[in-house]
Amino acid sequence: MFDVSFTELIVIGVVALIVLGPERLPKVARTVGHLLGRAQRYVHDVKSDIQREIELDELRKFKQQIDSTAQDVNQSLRSATDSLRASGDSLRAELDDTARTVNEAAADIQRTIAPHPAITAETDTSKLPGTPATLPATAAAEPTPAAPAASQAEAPKSPSTGNAT
């Protein structure tokens, strides 16, 4: 602590022995030892208090940094949540508009397809304008020109042997 060498201690002891005498020297040495011990303990306590305050100060700074970072993260999460909610609300509004348009179009189609009250199952459809009259029976029975060509293509061919039969 004071950086005193052994030779310096011997010199101090000899001077104390001469000044104090052999009767009082042990008592004074004991008292000086107790005082030095108290001083060392006091210095140690002050050092530890200062060290604790420094650590507390560092911890406070660290806590403040963590708190500010947490607030920044919380703020960014809130802004992201708000923007997502706004996007979701706009999408919901667009989907509602689209659904309304589709429902209106479906209702228009249903009104267009629904039979008019004047037309019923009992009404003769051949008398309606734009409906062709009944087809003649001969037209339905006649084969189309593509049908004979197909039947000729399907007929098995006899192998030609070169002999005319």
UniProtKB/Swiss-Prot annotation:
Record's compositionally biased regions (Low complexity): 127-159
TM regions (residue ranges): 1-21
Domain of life, source organism: Bacteria
Record flagged with keyword Membrane: yes
Location in the cell: Cell inner membrane
Membrane topology: Single-pass membrane protein
Composition bias, Polar residues: 67-84
One GO molecular-function entry: protein transmembrane transporter activity
Keywords of this entry: Cell inner membrane, Cell membrane, Membrane, Protein transport, Translocation, Transmembrane, Transmembrane helix, Transport
One GO CC term on file: TAT protein transport complex
Chief place of localization: membrane
Annotated GO biological process: protein transport by the Tat complex
Cysteine pairings via disulfide bonds: none
InterPro entries registered for this protein in UniProt: TatA/B/E (IPR003369), TatB (IPR018448)
Region (Disordered): 67-165
Role description: Part of the twin-arginine translocation (Tat) system that transports large folded proteins containing a characteristic twin-arginine motif in their signal peptide across membranes. Together with TatC, TatB is part of a receptor directly interacting with Tat signal peptides. TatB may form an oligomeric binding site that transiently accommodates folded Tat precursor proteins before their translocation.
Recorded family membership: Belongs to the TatB family.
PANTHER family: SEC-INDEPENDENT PROTEIN TRANSLOCASE PROTEIN TATA, CHLOROPLASTIC
Oligomeric and partner information: The Tat system comprises two distinct complexes: a TatABC complex, containing multiple copies of TatA, TatB and TatC subunits, and a separate TatA complex, containing only TatA subunits. Substrates initially bind to the TatABC complex, which probably triggers association of the separate TatA complex to form the active translocon.
Protein name: Sec-independent protein translocase protein TatB
Organism annotation: Bordetella avium (strain 197N)
Gene, per the UniProt record: tatB
